[in-house]
Amino acid sequence: STLAAVLAGNEKFTVTEGSAEFLGRDLLSMPIEDRARLGLFLGFQYPVEIPGVTMANFMKLAVNEQRKFRGEEPLSAAEFLKLMREKSAVVELSSKLTSRAVNEGFSGGEKKKNEIFQMAMLDPKLAILDETDSGLDIDALRIVATGVTKLHRADNATVVITHYQRLLDYIVPDVVHVLYKGRIIHSGDKSLALRLEKEGYDWLINEYDR
C-alpha cells in the first residue's frame, strides 16, 4: 500500500532516496494529476465517497482531461454515454449507480466494481490495485477479477496488491513478487502464490532475515 501511494503521488510520503520512471519520465517529480493524465491509475483499498458529484460527471471530466493531455478532442455527450455503457458492462455495473454520487451509499462490492469501471473508462497504461479483493464476497470477487482480466492487453500492465491467493483463482498473474521491508525478496509465477497460501510467508522471511 505504501508503494502504491508513493507511485500515485500521495503527499503524506516523502521519498528520501531512489527513483521511479514511468514511460521514460521521472515519475517522482510529477504532480499527482500529471501522473494520472500520463496513464497511472490507483484503485483504492477503501474507495472514498464524493457527495454531490455524479459518477457520470466525474468520469466525463476525467476522461476528457486525459484526452486534452494527449491533444485529442473531448468526447461529445453521445460518445461519452456510449463509452460509459460499454465499460459498465465489463463489470456488470448498474446504470442506476452511474447516475448517483461517486460511491455514495454503494455497498463494498459496488465500490470495488466502480473502481474497475473507472479503470476501464480511463484505460491506463499502468493500474495499481491495492487490496481490491478486500471485503468482497465470492460473486463480487469474480466480477471484479473478470473485469481486470478483460482489460489486460499487451500495451498495458496491472499491479495487483493482495495478501490472499483467492483472487488468483480468477486472475492468472504473469509474475508474483513478494515485497518485504521495502524490497522484493522473491519472485515467481502463480505457483509461488499457491505455495504462500499453503505454507505462509515464514519460510521466506526467515531466509531473508538470516
Give the positions of each predicted feature.
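Conserved ABC transporter NBD signature motif
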Residues: 16-25
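Conserved beta-strand-loop-alpha-helix hinge in the C-terminal portion
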Residues: 175, 179, 183-206
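Helix-to-loop junction immediately C-terminal to a conserved catalytic motif
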Residues: 8
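Conserved H-loop
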Residues: 155-163
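Walker B catalytic motif
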Residues: 128-132, 139
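Helical segment within the ABC ATPase nucleotide-binding domain
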Residues: 141-154
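ABC ATPase C-loop
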Residues: 119-120
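Q-loop/switch helix immediately C-terminal to the Walker
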Residues: 38, 42-46, 52-68, 80-83
